[in-house]
């Protein structure tokens, strides 16, 4: 019989002998077997009782004799093997715990067996159980349990408790050091218990395994474990966060196995379970996680998130929430004091040349739009969309004229805008994201796309531009350290320029998964901003914090500059979002369609290296058209005058770092004035 406790059988030997010779003693033996034995040992002793109740006297005597010999043999062999150990007392207690674990068929069998074998093979005699930590399989917790057992043993037998050698050495140092008299002895530094980072791979795996019953023998396969753990982890267990790497969150399982928090069994299909130390870590994580969840701010996503989706997809940390509020809620405090309503919107704009059309929040929902070129790799084009769907956001994927991600107000009724003479069923919101991976950002700076994209973003009229920079490992050879530093300075300068000069919000993310989480949080927040509270409060108005108004396309066609009109309207009503229909926005932001002569001239000027958007604008103000610019050069006959024409003319307009230097002026003259290079 497997996992039979030998000591329990030895304890039953006298009563087994009595029951063999006296029939009246058998009921007492059966009652004690039922009360004092467990598991395989109980099954073994019960079978003896049943055989002794049989009528074959010869078989009964033979079985009892065999049991005596078997039990005595176990006792002698164990005693001999334990006596050869340098620490028989400690070994005996570990053996006792190992037998108990085998009887109950618990997960501690593996731990105690490893500790038993290490202690048995150790030739060193330990003065204190704490010294056993140097053995493989004996950690601080098991040594602490041995120490408590030794204290009980010494108290029971009237023996002095051995002193911990580490404490004794500290006391000795204190007594021999006369200069340090009066100073408290330094406490021995206890090893810190393992604490995985929040929403990391080990964190998710431990939480998933803790969903099993601690007192059962249950376990999980890899597929089951990944399915359970994924909602608790920010990284994917199946797809690497970096396309150039092969590591996923599943690689953290090796850490848990090394630290003996998880053990495996079964071959070839491995199954995973928590050890006793693993269960302690899991309980500590759950206590910490409960406090963390109480500090989170849930978003209202009832219309998009199904009931069986994890709650973690709807919760976001407080730090990220503050980051968003600092970015996109600058006008909320002023709005709370004024309480503007949709009814007063038309009255405030009666004297304006453009009359916006107020839109009720009940007519639309906020929809996330992704560019078709936003993919993880060429072979995994749907990764971003699928991950957003898992987080409760269903994006629409289409080709965008500008930006990589934007948000629109999508009407429930597709024909809603027709009564105002507009096409489509979507109005642009004032939020757009330009996503740049770090290597792509460096490339766009080098080839000029960086400035051209920012120029089109400004011309689109979108107020809140988010420049999202995704970290990426850009490797350089050791011999090319100077180039690496150059790229680092280039990126830092571009980020500073984007924030200070262009006034865009720069968001840096660690990887693609972090970017996806950011887009999901932004979508939830915008939905809260543009939707009325539900249920409405009886004391406060049930109006959203931001309202939406449509700028008719016909007014934009008559307006000399829709951007200046937008700026005027936004200054008068900062809490109102003024948007155009999506088709109109695409026409305005198109790279080639509906370009004015001014726009073409600006793009032509920016083709010269060193001419930024601001410098091109100032040049265009002095010489409105390409023809005027060329004629200005033709009127000058002296090559030196042509070379310095732009620099001299712009000297009083642009100062400081924005000033056009003589070198740049010569470059412009070579292109536009026919000056030989």
Curated annotation (Swiss-Prot):
Instruction: Give the Enzyme Commission number.
Output: 3.1.22.-
According to the lineage, what is the superkingdom?
Answer: Eukaryota
Q: Where is composition skewed (Basic and acidic residues) in this entry?
A: 156-177
- Cellular location of this protein? Nucleus
Which cofactors, by name? Mg(2+)
EC category: hydrolase
What quaternary arrangement does the UniProt entry report? Interacts with eme1.
State the PANTHER family in the record.
CLASS II CROSSOVER JUNCTION ENDONUCLEASE MUS81, CROSSOVER JUNCTION ENDONUCLEASE MUS81
Which family does this protein fall into? Answer: Belongs to the XPF family.
Q: What is this protein called?
A: Crossover junction endonuclease mus81
Please tell me the species this chain comes from. Emericella nidulans (strain FGSC A4 / ATCC 38163 / CBS 112.46 / NRRL 194 / M139) (Aspergillus nidulans)
The gene that this protein is the product of is mus81
